[in-house]
Design a protein with these regions (language model features):
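A helix-centric hydrophobic-segment signal that preferentially recognizes long
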Residues: 2-198
């Protein structure tokens, strides 16, 4: 009887070792860590915006509409609670991504409009903020890429047999992923014309 129990325990241990639970835990933590980095970089960008807005406000005839768009987009982006659970809710993730995309677009328009204001372009404080913003945008891209990779690794794992059975038993589901904005437009190759066609 003791031999039977020993064999049963050994069999159970080997089955549990091969079920992938520990690997699911590891990949899940990697996704959470990568997500925390994404949030940290988005927060860094959000923290820079008030300084940029105040610097730009100093330019008396600056286009207020563009500035208002940036302020409103920042308010919308920071109103969405970016919790670790957000990656488990595709609809919430889509809302978060849309708000961050709108903020990126508003900032891009602001930087384009700034080109029309030589005094602002020459302002060292603004140039420093602009450099910090560009660096932050690069960090956001790196953090998003790491998150995409971690999420992809996790999602592949929880769909593979026999780990998918363990994932199902313990309630692990695929995680929401960042999507490409304007996916159809990105897939279509651009038409390049150097003025040679007549």
């Amino acid at each position: 009887m003791t031999l039977f129990r020993t064999l049963l325990v050994a069999l159970a241990a080997s089955v549990l070792a091969g079920c992938g639970y520990n690997e699911i835990q590891s990949k899940d933590e990697a996704v959470k860590g990568a997500w925390a980095e994404v949030i940290s970089q988005y927060q860094r960008r959000a923290d820079l915006i008030p300084n940029i807005v105040e610097t730009v406000k100093g330019e008396a005839d600056f286009e207020r509409g563009t500035l208002t768009q940036v302020i409103e987009a920042r308010a919308k982006a920071t109103s969405i609670q970016a919790t670790p659970e957000l990656v488990n809710d595709p609809a919430a993730m889509a809302r978060f991504q849309q708000a961050q995309g709108e903020l990126s677009s508003a900032l891009s328009r602001l930087m384009a409009v700034v080109e029309n204001y030589p005094n602002l372009k020459a302002n060292q404080g603004f140039q420093d903020l602009r450099t910090q913003l560009e660096g932050t945008e690069n960090r956001i891209t790196v953090a998003r890429n790491r998150f995409i990779k971690a999420t992809q690794d996790y999602n592949v794992l929880v769909r593979q047999f026999p780990v998918n059975l363990t994932a199902m038993v313990f309630g692990y589901k695929q995680k929401a992923q960042f999507t490409v904005e304007n996916e159809a437009a990105v897939q279509k190759a651009p038409t390049v014309d150097f003025g040679t066609k007549k």
